[in-house]
Amino acid sequence: MRDTLSDLEAGKQLSDENPIIRAQKLMQAQLPKRFYEQVEVAEVEGGFAVHLDGRPVKTPARSLLMLPTASAAEIVAEEFRAQEKVIDPGKMPATRLVNTAIDGIAQDPQAVLEDILRFAGTDLLCYRADAPQELVSRQTARWDPLIDWAETLGARFTLAEGVMHVEQSREAITAFGIHLSAFTDPIALASLHTMTTLTGSAIIALAIAKGEVSAEDGWTLAHIDEDWTTEQWGEDAEAAARRKARAVEMMIAARVIKAL
């Protein structure tokens, strides 16, 4: 039996410097047929693997797909059980996240940590509307508590109105980075990076990871501007569909990091 997901490999060359892009390129190819009946989580040396008919799942780069906890591995197992005629990575966000972590982030975790910190330097929560007053008030009421929370971590962020760039202090980014660096597991970093890029806010991502806010509340906080615009002008169907798809990715990332 071939290695699971080997048909998803896009090529042997991993020339991309970005470890996330490098890992994701391995997962872009013709979809393999579902060839298994039973999906189980099995304890192995160093963690927990997902077995298909008794054989361990491997990543596109042929590494063992292993997670540190049984509950995290079960999230991936659920996705394999849900596959029907083919194995479709597009419907397997947790599996993609773990593959990215193992094949990419584990090789260069510092690059991913630095990318999250770059988001912190231009965090969504730091850029406020100057009008209309209703939106200004909504942002203040909903975003300020997380800005205050970040300050309790030693990260004092500077706010700005409009689109003018504001430089965050080295002290704020350093303090924020100390708390991010506590998440050393590549899968945790993958989850944090996913939540950060989907929301545009490293503060929201860290707050979810630390249990300060729920994933659902964090997602709502990230869309205050969008929701206000929808209230004024109505919903765009295509934008709503894209948001719904991103929300699935967001909730899975939050669920995985909580299960580690």
Language-model segment annotations:
Residues 2-35, 39, 214-260:
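Extended, aromatic/histidine-rich regions of cofactor-dependent oxidoreductases associated
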Residues 3-107:
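An N-terminal structural lobe/cap that precedes and organizes the functional/catalytic core
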Residues 64, 131-134, 138, 187, ...:
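Conserved aromatic-histidine-acidic binding/catalytic patches
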Residues 70-73, 95, 109, 113, ...:
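Alpha-helix initiation and N-capping motif
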Residues 81, 146, 151, 207-213:
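Hydrophobic/aromatic-lined pockets within catalytic cores
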Residues 110-175:
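Internal, conserved structured core segments that host functional sites
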Residues 166-239, 252:
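An internal, amphipathic alpha-helical element
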